[in-house]
Amino acid sequence: MKKRLIAPMLLSAASLAFFAMSGSAQAAAYTDYSLYKVEPSNTFSTESQASQAVAKLEKDTGWDASYQASGTTTTYQISASGIHSESEAKAILSGLAKQTSITGTSSPVGSKQPYVTISSGAISGEKQANTILAKLKQETGVAGAVKAYGAAQPYMNVMTSDIADETKVKALIQSLAKQTGIKSSYQPITHTVSVTTIQSGTIVGDSRAAQIKNAFQKESGLQASLKETVKGQAYYTFTTAAISGEANAKTLLQQLKQSTGITGSYKSINQKTTVESYNVQSAYFKGLSTVKDAISQIKKNTGVSGSYQQVGKSTSYTVNMKGITKQQLQKIDTFFKKKKWHYTSSSVKKTTTSAAYQITTAKILGEQQANKAAAFFAQKKVKAAKTAAGSTAENQYQLISEETSDQAKVTKGLNILKKNQLSASAKSVKKQIADTFKITTESLLDQTKVNQALTFFKSNHISVASQKTGQTAASSYQITTEAIISQEEIDRVLTFFKQNHIAVTTSKTGQTAYTQYKIVTTQLSSKTALNNGLTYLKSKSVTPSYTTKSNTLYKISVNEQFTGNDTAAAASTKLKQLYGWTSSIVKIKNGPQIMKTNYNLSLRDMVQKQMTVSPQTDGAAYVSLTYINTATSTVTADVLNIRSTPEVSPTNVIGQFKKGDKVKVIGQINGWAKINLGWRNASSDEVVQYVDPNNFSRDSKYYFQFLKLSQTAGLSVTEVNQKVLAGKGILTGRAKAFIDAANQYSINELYLISHALLETGNGTSALANGLTYNGKTVYNMYGIGAYDSNPNYYGAKYAYEQGWFTPEAAIIGGAKFIGSSYIHNTAYNQDTLYKMRWSATATHQYATDIGWAYKQVNRMYSLYSLLDGYTLYFDVPEYR
């Protein structure tokens, strides 16, 4: 009994071939071929702006664009008055833009007014004038400048005679400033005098130096200090190790004195020397000749002589070597190891006493001399020990007195040093000393201040005089305001000077300007912006008002169509970069999504692989009419090539006729007879026609052989019910079940529907409309499990076992079977008609007919032709 198994698209090939599949095809991502529009969201408040934007867009991008009205909007415009200057108007506009992002323009109101300056009369003193000017600025907000007024007057200094006491000078300066406010300074008056310093000779010892210093200061009246001239140092001696030979000791002493000036002596000492040697005895040697030979080898290889000794009365002997050195023992050890001989050794120590000499230096003062001795012995390679001698030399000092011009004190000092048996000297030098001082006031312009200074010093019994400094300055000053135009400012300045009892004059500058300005904002598109603008302007003490206006809005349309979402997104990004516009991307037509799978083969290699499994075709063949007897339809040549195309080519020969063979001629073309062979082997030229994907254009129905059956197309339930399943018996209105099944098991919706339509006879079969099995009504929409001997019984039995008790359950359950058995079979990975026919390994191919995939597309294509809303996914092979 034969079981009916559903095969993809109901295979109609001449024969089927199933083999194990292997391969390494690599799929890329999908390329979107849907059509999109890019719709900018920006609007323009005037038609002129929109028109200019379209023109610029077309120029910048080359895209076709247009604009159209897009509703209306209300705008607001604020105006404000009560502004007194252009700078104030600009400042308000700047603040308005910063605080609210509202921009606008300013313009003058009324006629121009003249600028004026206001000048004061004479003011005594520059300081007083600057004080009044600062007060003017503070109270009126009007700035100005101070300038000299009238003839220049000389600056004066007041200078005292010499004053001996510096403390008194400082007190007078402080008192002058306190009483008159006049600052002054003082300068020392210097004189040349001779001063003498006493210096003593060397004083040895700390206590003696301190004693002489105290006596000197007490008896001479001069202060003195002690300068350390020589630092006290320690004494050392050096004692050498044993020196062999008295002559060597004498010679070394002489060299020490010549080299360093250091003397010494030597003495005889006893020197004990311990010498270590070794006695070696070998292991046994058998026979006298053997031991003698060993002694000879030892002598030759180590240089050590030995003797032999018999072991008892045996024929064995040992080699004995006595009094050998450590170096000789090492040679013996190396040689014996090389010969693999054994030995024992023992150490022997011997002490001898001999006469030697030892040098001891005289006492050496200080580290410097001691280092010379150490360096000498080190150079002579004689070991010597340094020892402190237990005593030190005393420090040495020199007494130095303070400077004095009193010769009596100098004489006393010299006598005191001589009395203490010390040499002494007196050194005199000329020096400038300051013993009087002179006070000079700051430069004074006001004669009143000069008189105050003169009176002050005279009242303190100090001789004093005034003198010109050579500099002059004005004694009276005038204030002149900056140019002002506002009547309010003019009135404030005049009132200020009047209150301060200062006469003034007003002068026109010759310049004019506006004194009133107004501000007008741009059109505002929201109430929020309007309120923000009004609030800000009121805070600046101006009077704002506003008007409203209804405006037509304009919107730009980009009329270009973009293939693929990525291309549309790039266009949207370009608009953002060029103009700052945001855009929405709208799909206007579903297009195919195409991926390319690289088979890692050349097209030639693929065809050669397919030729090894004998691909079949029922297409016509061709033979040359020259060798056909058309009357009898027989071959006249001994051998006649049968070709797949009406031309001579090395790749289109598919067989041969012999002389006398009968042929069935079904047509003629350019000297070729078109014949019918039924199913036959295909030529490589015929195979390449179907294998090469470039032979099928994307807009032809045959492109559906690349349709990815493992990908849903996003169909509409309503559209499928209305256009595909209407009038299809039990399947009518079941689009949702098919679409749910497709989504659940990742299968193309129309692939499932086409199976169901074919298996159920467009929804009319008994299995599809429900059969009773074991008391339950069951449904089978794909004929799964139905044996040819009794398809209704076995199809119902299979449906019962699967629990398909509703049409929907049968549709969805059958989809699971189809998906796991065919579409998603991981062993073969054949989810397109092309892959089912043309495996990269030429194995597990669903048919031998080279046109199988080509012929299967008609039903799928016809169903999709009924629909509008879908997205198709294609997987197209790619050959090297």
UniProtKB/Swiss-Prot annotation:
What are the protein's GO molecular function terms?
amidase activity; mannosyl-glycoprotein endo-beta-N-acetylglucosaminidase activity; peptidoglycan binding
The name on file for this protein is: Beta-N-acetylglucosaminidase
Task: State the GO CC annotations.
Answer: extracellular region
**How does the annotation summarize its subunit structure?**
Homodimer.
Signal peptide as annotated in the record = 1-27
Q: Which cysteines are joined by disulfide bonds?
A: none
Top-tier EC class: hydrolase
Lineage, broadest ranks:
Bacteria, Bacillati, Bacillota, Bacilli, Bacillales
Q: What is its EC number?
A: 3.2.1.96
Which residue ranges does the record assign to the SPOR domain?
70-149, 150-229, 230-311
- Expression induction or repression: In stationary phase; under control of SigD.
The record's subcellular locations are: Secreted; Secreted, Cell wall
Q: How is its activity regulated?
A: Inhibited by diethyl pyrocarbonate, slightly by EDTA. Not inhibited by PMSF, diisopropyl fluorophosphate, 2-mercaptoethanol or N-ethylmaleimide.
Q: What happens when the gene is disrupted?
A: Cells lacking this gene show no motility changes on swarm plates; however in combination with an amidase deletion (lytC, AC Q02114) greatly reduced motility is seen.
